[in-house]
Amino acid sequence: MSYKLELLRRALEHNVLKFGTFTLKSGRKSPYFFNSGNFTHGADLCALAEAYAETIIAMNVDFDVIFGPAYKGISLAAITAVKLYEKTGKSYGFAYNRKEAKSHGEGGNLVGAEMEGKKVLLLDDVITAGTAIREAISFLEPKHVKLAGIVLLLDRQERLDPEVNESTIGRLKKELNLPVSSILTLDDIVDFTKSDLTAAESKAMDAYRQQYQAK
């Protein structure tokens, strides 16, 4: 799909996608790193919005509000709401959380559209072990919303357990009984970059996939 290729091209151009040796939040060593925070210009955000919107339209899921967890999810949800309005004419609500509750003004830890009783689509960037997504779901539960689905920028396709061939997204789908989609996957990254990597980088990626990727 053209929007995937455009995102991957920009990811390499702006060092969103890098190869080397990186330590993930989990402590695992990885031969590649994807930092969506390096999408910092209007053209990049336009490409991101296009990709999220096309993925959501293809999901054909019914929802009222787009929720983006702080911090990276905030801008992702905002630009996606704009792009969906341009493409479909539907004006979806947009909301996000504060990591620190505000004690003055409107107060609280939720900003944006009213969500109580609404169908909410959760957006985020990269999923590895699913910790951030579970935290976002825990935040939403007491708000009395109906979670309609989850859309991610990148699925690293990693096993939850080295001994079990099940991905984080696979487990989430089973646990939540909800649609969970990602724009990009590790397979997409490998296919797009295979002719550009050095021999050492290719070897490291192959070894990493053999050890950690869910088949």
From Swiss-Prot:
* Gene3D superfamilies tied to this protein: 3.40.50.2020
Asked if the record carries the keyword Transferase, the reply is yes
Q: Which residues bind 5-phospho-alpha-D-ribose 1-diphosphate?
A: 25, 71-72, 98-99, 102, 104, 124-132
Reactions the enzyme catalyzes? orotidine 5'-phosphate + diphosphate = orotate + 5-phospho-alpha-D-ribose 1-diphosphate
Keyword list, A-Z? Glycosyltransferase, Pyrimidine biosynthesis, Transferase
Q: Which GO terms describe its cellular component?
A: cytoplasm; cytosol; nucleus
Its pathway, per UniProt, is: Pyrimidine metabolism; UMP biosynthesis via de novo pathway; UMP from orotate: step 1/2
- Binding positions (orotate): F33, F34, T128, R156
**What GO terms are given for molecular function?**
orotate phosphoribosyltransferase activity
Pfam families named among the record's database cross-references: Pribosyltran (PF00156)
The processes (GO biological process) annotated in the record are: 'de novo' pyrimidine nucleobase biosynthetic process; 'de novo' UMP biosynthetic process; pyrimidine nucleotide biosynthetic process; pyrimidine ribonucleoside biosynthetic process
Q: What is its EC class?
A: transferase
Q: Which InterPro entries match?
A: OPRT, Or_phspho_trans_dom, PRibTrfase_dom, PRTase-like
What's its job?
Catalyzes the transfer of a ribosyl phosphate group from 5-phosphoribose 1-diphosphate to orotate, leading to the formation of orotidine monophosphate (OMP).
The Swiss-Prot or TrEMBL record describes its family as follows:
Belongs to the purine/pyrimidine phosphoribosyltransferase family. PyrE subfamily.
Subunit composition? Homodimer.
Q: What is this protein identified as?
A: Orotate phosphoribosyltransferase
Species, as recorded: Schizosaccharomyces pombe (strain 972 / ATCC 24843) (Fission yeast)
What is this protein's gene name? ura5
